[in-house]
């Protein structure tokens, strides 16, 4: 991307992407008119450009994004990928992020790749044939490592409460952050847990190695930890490298409610920015300001509700701004988006219960 923005001969280029970490020069004011960022899920680096109207945001379920590409509702001219090196059979893989990248790579003729020696080789539906790559560059650089939010007393208490709701034989879905980490850190006395999730991070590694996560009782992808992407430390990336027990699938499969519901005792742990007294959950915006995106929360909340013995959980601290602002409110802020409807909410957990 850094090289792309230096091209002075390019005009009106639309860049469709999920969360981007690091440099986002393509969204700087001086490139307006040449490049247009279109976030399908966003983060800290692009909130300001979106708020100022220099970048676009599309509210969409993560599970619906692959169809945008495969049906050419969004016709892609080229895709930029970071891949693992090819094996003896000429198979590269999408590494840590299969999610929407698989559909994108299958839906365009031009694949531009960075083949990174440090990208782990992953299994599942991760293969990109080397022969399909139009142009590539080789690199040997560390992957981005996500910093873990520190666990405070509030997160610890929420983690204890949710861990108490997780039964032996449960199938887990969780995100990244202090609360999911706090939950996972308190599951070491459980047995035969399974993982079927949109993403996971470092704490799952410990549960697998200790034999807490076996995936033995899952009905879908039995014996396999299933995800669409991972983010965390080098330790996590080393764990998934050439690991046949971890399968990466496109997010229209991992987040398919019909598959999620087939697993037993699905515990879906999802967060919120605020929730009103009727149960409406805002998880993607602060008033009119876009904060992140819709993601897969609704898919897993609904899938867990349909699972036999499932527990769809919205977890959040009761307050923000060092206790000065309640996150449990009579009504959502003006402009706030509803990600999960009041009809889909079953369990809400704060530090008070």
What are these regions, as identified by a protein language model?
Residues 1-352:
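Conserved alpha/beta enzyme-core scaffold
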């Amino acid at each position: 991307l850094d090289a792309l923005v230096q091209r002075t001969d390019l005009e009106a280029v639309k860049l469709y992407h999920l969360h981007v970490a690091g440099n986002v020069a393509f969204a700087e004011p001086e490139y307006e008119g040449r490049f247009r960022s279109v976030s399908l899920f966003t983060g800290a680096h692009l909130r300001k450009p979106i708020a100022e109207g220099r970048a676009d945001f599309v509210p969409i379920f993560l599970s619906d994004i692959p169809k945008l590409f495969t049906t050419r509702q969004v016709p892609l001219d080229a895709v930029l990928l970071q891949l693992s090196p090819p094996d003896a059979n000429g198979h590269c893989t999408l590494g840590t992020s299969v999610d929407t990248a698989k559909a994108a790579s299958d839906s365009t003729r031009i694949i531009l790749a960075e083949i990174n020696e440090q990208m782990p080789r992953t299994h599942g539906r991760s293969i990109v044939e080397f022969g399909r790559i139009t142009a590539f560059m080789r690199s040997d650089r560390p992957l981005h490592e996500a910093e873990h939010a520190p666990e405070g007393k509030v997160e610890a208490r929420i983690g204890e409460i949710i861990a108490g709701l997780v039964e032996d034989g449960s199938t887990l879905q969780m995100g990244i952050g202090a609360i999911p980490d706090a939950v996972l850190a308190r599951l070491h006395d459980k047995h035969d847990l399974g993982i079927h999730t949109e993403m996971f991070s470092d704490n799952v590694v410990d549960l697998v190695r200790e034999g807490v996560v076996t995936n033995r009782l899952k009905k879908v992808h039995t014996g396999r930890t299933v995800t669409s992407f991972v983010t965390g430390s080098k330790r996590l990336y080393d764990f998934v490298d050439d690991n046949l027990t971890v399968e990466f699938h496109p997010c229209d499969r991992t987040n398919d409610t019909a598959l999620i519901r087939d697993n037993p005792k699905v515990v879906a742990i999802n967060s919120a920015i605020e929730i009103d007294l009727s149960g409406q959950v805002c998880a993607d915006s602060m008033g009119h300001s876009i904060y992140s995106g819709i993601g897969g929360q609704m898919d897993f909340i609904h899938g867990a509700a349909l699972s036999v013995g499932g527990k769809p959980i919205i977890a959040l601290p009761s307050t923000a701004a060092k206790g000065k602002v309640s996150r449990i409110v009579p009504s959502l802020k003006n402009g706030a988006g509803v990600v999960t409807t009041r009809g889909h909410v079953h369990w809400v957990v704060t530090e008070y219960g």
